[in-house]
Amino acid sequence: MTQFNIPVTMSSSLSIILVILVSLRTALSELCNPQDKQALLQIKKDLGNPTTLSSWLPTTDCCNRTWLGVLCDTDTQTYRVNNLDLSGHNLPKPYPIPSSLANLPYLNFLYIGGINNLVGPIPPAIAKLTQLHYLYITHTNVSGAIPDFLSQIKTLVTLDFSYNALSGTLPPSISSLPNLGGITFDGNRISGAIPDSYGSFSKLFTAMTISRNRLTGKIPPTFANLNLAFVDLSRNMLEGDASVLFGSDKNTKKIHLAKNSLAFDLGKVGLSKNLNGLDLRNNRIYGTLPQGLTQLKFLQSLNVSFNNLCGEIPQGGNLKRFDVSSYANNKCLCGSPLPSCT
C-alpha cells in the first residue's frame, strides 16, 4: 500500500488555512454588531472584569443570548444591542458608571441595580443614548445630583433612580420630556422644593414617587393640572396644602403622603372613584373625613392616624375593613371603630 507523506511545511500551511476558514465562518455567522461587542467588552473592563460577566467573551456572539443581561433587536433584524441589564454584579472595588455605555447608541432599556460598589455621579455620556426609553439606576451608591442633561433624551418613558446616594435638588428640566410617564426617586438625599414645572408634565405622566428624601416647602399649586394614578411623597418635610392632589375628576389610585407636615381640610377634597390606597398618617391634616370614602369600591388601604381630624367616622362601604390603627391619635375623631361620639 502506497503511503503519501505530506511535508511538515505543507501540513502547517493547511492547519493555518483551516483556522482561517473556521474563523471566517464564525465571523460571517455572528449576529452581534462589532461596535456593540467592542462597547460591551469595554464596559466589562470599566467595571473591573467582574466574574459575573464571565460569559462576555470576545470569541462568542453577544446576540446569542449567552451574554448575561444582553439582548439584541431581533424584531427588525438589525441585531443591535437594545437591552442591557447590569444588575447584581459584585465589583472588585468601587467603580463609576462606565461612560463607555454611550457606545451602545441603540439602547432602549438600561437597568443598573444592586451594585454596592458603583459610585460617583451619573455620567454625561448617558445623554448620548438618544433612543433610550427606560432608565433604571437603583440600589447603588451612585451620588451627586440628578442631572439636567436627562432632558436631552426625548424618548424617555421611565426614570427610576430609587435607593441610591443622590443629593442636590430636583431638576426642573425633566418636566419637558414629552414621553415621560413616571419618575421614581425614592430613598435618596434629595433636598429643596419640588419645582413648579413639575405641574406641567405631559398628559402621559401618571406616576410620581419621591418618598424618603429631604424635600421641603409646599406642593406646587400647578399639581392641580396633573392626573396622577400614583403619587408618593411620603417621609419628607413638606408642608402646607396637598388638596391639589385630590379631585373627583382624576384617575388617582394611590396617594401616599405620610410623615410630612402637611395641613389642609380633608373634608373639602374630592375623591377619585378609582382610589384604592390613601396614606395620610403623621401630618397636621384637619377637618372631617369625607363622606365619599364610603363610596370607594376599590379602597383597600386607609391610614389617617396622627393628624388633627375631628367628627364622626363615616360608616359603610369598604370602611368596615379598617380597624382602630387607621384612625388613631387624631384630635377628636369618633365613631366605630373608635369610641362612640358623645
From Swiss-Prot:
Membrane topology: Peripheral membrane protein
GO cellular component: extracellular region; membrane
Protein's UniProt keywords contain Secreted: yes
Cystine connections: 32-62, 63-72, 310-332, 334-341
Keywords, alphabetical: Cell wall, Disulfide bond, Glycoprotein, Leucine-rich repeat, Membrane, Plant defense, Repeat, Secreted, Signal
One Pfam family hit: LRRNT_2
Keyword Flavoprotein: no
Origin superkingdom: Eukaryota
Record's function text: Inhibitor of fungal polygalacturonase. It is an important factor for plant resistance to phytopathogenic fungi. Substrate preference is polygalacturonase (PG) from A.niger >> PG of F.oxysporum, A.solani or B.cinerea. Not active on PG from F.moniliforme.
Family designation: Belongs to the polygalacturonase-inhibiting protein family.
Additional free-text comment from the UniProt record: Mutation of Lys-253 confers the ability to inhibit the F.moniliforme PG.
Protein name (database record): Polygalacturonase inhibitor 1
Organism for this UniProt entry: Phaseolus vulgaris
Protein's gene: PGIP1
